[in-house]
From Swiss-Prot:
Protein name: Beta-carotene isomerase D27, chloroplastic
InterPro entries: D27-like, D27-like_C
Additional observations: Roots of plants silencing D27 exhibit a strong reduction in strigolactone synthesis.
A single MF term (Gene Ontology): beta-carotene isomerase activity
Tissue: Highly expressed in roots. Expressed at low levels in leaves and stems.
Cofactors named for this entry: Fe cation
Keyword set includes Transit peptide: yes
Catalytically driven reaction(s): all-trans-beta-carotene = 9-cis-beta-carotene
Organism: Medicago truncatula
Gene transcribed to yield this protein: D27
Length: 252
């Protein structure tokens, strides 16, 4: 696979409306992976070791809400509960739909999960600024631990000033449960970047580290073009559940 295979008539930074059109009338498969190095370099111990989560009532409510939103977007329901239900809904999306459709499905699910009036209010009262970037970082660490796992706010430099605008996710819960690079890219990174930018006017670059399953969300930073994004040049894991159980080529 080669990233040059991306359709030339497809924008590298499409709007949310354009993604919905692509989802409804897909014409091309969006190539999001390039074989860059052997998967033997990835520690199997890292892949096999999983954290144990004790979800509270809020976590369970949020997980169920997002899972139901994904199921509604795919039109395929499941009878599992808790985080297993969310992983199953995401796995079905990765098996039944091409990569362009997968990203569109998650955008649809996020539209269902978060009321538009609330998003509009947040966008109006918090235009892009140092305060907004730091607010989004803190908010993410507090209210999305159920999805991302433990995280912390870190500093970076923007226009010569230090800001606490980075969320460092120590080991992504979604990635460790799926063991799938393709699901990380198509069902999390790409649609989340677009949704946050389109909903709040806030650019964010999500930088996963597939060696240790950590990730950084850098608020205020535009993500690189698809052809230049290192995350899209990572082969999937040998222990990828989608590939192992369903012979799925999860990156194409």
């Amino acid at each position: 696979m080669d990233s040059k295979m991306i359709a030339h008539n497809m924008s590298l930074t499409p709007t949310l409306a354009q993604w919905k059109k692509l989802r409804l009338k897909p014409k091309h498969t969006f190539v999001v992976g390039v074989l860059a190095r052997p998967t033997d370099d990835i520690s199997e111990e890292t892949l096999r070791k999983t954290n144990v989560y004790k979800d509270n009532w809020f976590d369970k409510l949020a997980i169920n809400h997002l899972s139901k939103s994904v199921q509604a977007a795919t039109g395929i329901s499941n009878n599992k509960s808790g985080f297993d239900s969310l992983v199953e809904a995401a796995t079905v999306a990765s098996q039944k739909f091409n990569t362009t459709q997968q990203q569109g499905i998650i955008l649809d699910a996020l539209d269902r999960a978060f009321p538009k009036p609330i998003l509009s209010v947040i966008r109006r009262v918090m235009p892009p600024s140092k305060l907004a970037r730091e607010y989004f970082a803190v908010f993410t660490t507090i209210f999305f631990a159920w999805l991302l796992g433990p995280s912390e706010v870190r500093e970076s430099e923007i226009n010569g000033r230090r800001e606490k605008n980075i969320v460092h996710i120590k080991k992504c819960r979604f990635l460790e449960e799926t063991n799938c690079v393709g699901m990380c890219i198509n069902l999390c990174k790409m649609p989340s970047q677009l949704f946050i930018k389109d909903s709040f006017g806030m650019p964010v670059n999500m930088v996963p580290n597939f060696d240790d399953m950590s990730c950084e969300m850098i608020f205020g930073q535009e993500p690189p073009a698809s052809t230049d994004d290192p995350a899209l040049k990572q082969p999937c894991y040998k222990l990828c559940k989608a590939k192992k159980n369903h012979a799925t080529q999860c990156l194409s």
